[in-house]
């Protein structure tokens, strides 16, 4: 028993940079939930937090392996990707249950992959504890509009993003396979294409909006929050399980599966927006008319 307890403490010590980074990024997000902080402060803390994660994952070993130029370039690019992904996951937290349901659709495939590998890429109990925590949160948040008892806030959505990106990052480094980013693809498509759409509209990306596909479903199409959240989670789960069980475990098969899925989801997003975005424009026009009438 004492030896087992000592082993558990060794595991905690092995993860301390990740845990410290999680505390930092969740802490600044909690403060931001209470009093709005400048974007610059939040971004600096996020970059520092992911620096701690990269230290834990051994990303900085690239400097010794490939030299300073390649190591620095790869690290900076990876930092931009993970900070961007974190904020996309935060932006997607706009209807009841979506963060909890989608997190489960990412964590379950990670658990399956972790148990199918000769050497686990992350502590199995870590995934289990996080899944348990998300399930408990579901009891209070995975409810129809107006019925939720609590919300994730920035601290919840950014905290779970940090944890999932740590696990996926560890998986990618162990396997050398970047295509495991497919585990976050549904959020990635909606988030990135909505950002591109807003850039084309010359909008301030820092301002709140309702232009994500899931927001159009919930607001303009009046689809229930639980249905929208379930759709996103099930779509991601089907894609991930297909990748794990149906896709041959070869480099060309993995990249082909990823590329074809990106193309299909991108086309689906564009067709959806072409058909329904006018409803959002009508909503914005009605707001403008109300504002003019009040003046």
Q: Which positions does each model-derived feature cover?
A:
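"…together with the soluble PPM/PP2C metallo-phosphatase catalytic core" -> "…together
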Residues: 1-188
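N-terminal transmembrane signal-anchor/hairpin module of polytopic inner-membrane proteins
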Residues: 1-69, 175-295
